[in-house]
Regions:
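Structural motif corresponding to the early beta-alpha repeats
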Residues: 56, 71, 75-92, 117
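Structural motif
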Residues: 41, 45, 104-105, 141, ...
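Structural preference for beta-strand elements that scaffold enzyme active sites
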Residues: 13-17, 48-49, 75-81, 109-114, ...
């Protein structure tokens, strides 16, 4: 396993992190015992960055991490997010959300608490509500670091500029066919010593043969995906998962990304991605070619 430093927190974290959406039944039913096996397999392989959220399975993902981490809590860097979708981003709701997460996770502290889905609130509401609550929770020792999560980079930038945020998690913005984090956004995260977490380097499944169910009828999106894939066909390897390895290696070896998240519902899927975490990735010239090919071209809105 390869490790990196999570920005200004100074913590050493695995370059490959385990995302908790799949084991929270977000993409289909995963038996509880199977979820435990996935979590234990991750820890046994040296993965110490575990990512979940109150929203995933309406708390089920957190509950499963809580069960699986009995006796192993000190081995991992445990992260979650607040608040649940559809609830306000105010101070009281945030406090209640984090307290509920602590109970489900069966722990008395969270290593990293993150504002979830920043696009669904406003900067002022979040700063006076969620972020204010996070800062008080940090003073109380219930959280150790504070982050923000979202897909719209322009929404995330003002939070980074406050100086009160330690990490930023975004998704589908640093992948083979959408490189929009490259350039100004990475310059901003470097300037503020952000720990950058990259979610969904496979684009919610569009870099595989099985896009996420909620994308399978978006014909315009899938047509654009096919067009972009054709432009990088030389990277595709034989077999049904031809873009998976180059996509994972592209993210795992980016100097500006501390952690790349993988969602796994079965241990075998996790092991496949662990095999790519050996420090081998595209050359500087190959990376530059990708950045030039899709510069400024967002795939997802």
């Amino acid at each position: 396993m390869q490790y990196s430093t999570l920005g200004r927190t100074g913590w050493r974290v695995s370059r490959l992190g385990l995302g908790g959406a799949a084991i929270g039944n977000e993409f289909g039913d995963v038996p509880a015992a199977q979820a435990t096996r996935v979590i234990h397999a991750a820890i046994d392989a040296g993965i110490n960055y575990l990512d979940t959220a109150a929203q995933y399975g309406l708390g089920e993902s957190e509950r499963r991490f809580g069960v699986a981490l009995k006796g192993k809590r000190q081995q991992v860097f445990l992260t979650t997010k607040a608040v649940m979708r559809g609830t306000p981003y105010d101070y009281a709701t945030t406090m209640a959300s984090v307290e509920a997460s602590l109970q489900r996770l069966q722990t008395d502290y969270i290593d990293l608490i993150q504002l979830h889905e920043a696009e669904t609130t406003t900067f002022d509401v979040a700063m006076n509500g969620c972020i204010a609550a996070f800062l008080d929770l940090k003073k109380a020792g219930k959280v150790r670091a504070i982050g923000v999560n979202g897909r719209n980079l322009s929404v995330l930038a003002p939070y980074i500029q406050t100086g009160q945020i330690d990490t930023v998690l975004t998704f589908c913005r640093y992948m083979l066919i959408d490189t929009t984090m490259q350039g100004d956004f990475f310059a901003l995260t470097r300037a503020h010593q952000m720990g950058v977490i990259n979610g969904s380097p496979l684009g919610m499944g569009v870099m595989t043969d099985t896009p996420a169910p909620f994308l399978q009828h978006d014909h315009d999106l899938l047509a654009e995906v096919a067009r972009r894939k054709a432009q990088i066909a030389h990277l595709c390897q034989p077999g049904p998962h031809g873009f998976v390895e180059p996509a994972m290696r592209y993210s795992l070896t980016c100097d500006d990304i501390a952690v790349t998240l993988t969602g796994a519902a079965v241990p075998e899927q996790l092991q496949r991605n662990i095999a790519f975490c050996d420090g081998q990735g595209p050359s500087d010239s190959e990376r530059a070619s990708l950045h030039a090919l899709f510069a400024g071209q967002r795939l997802f809105a």
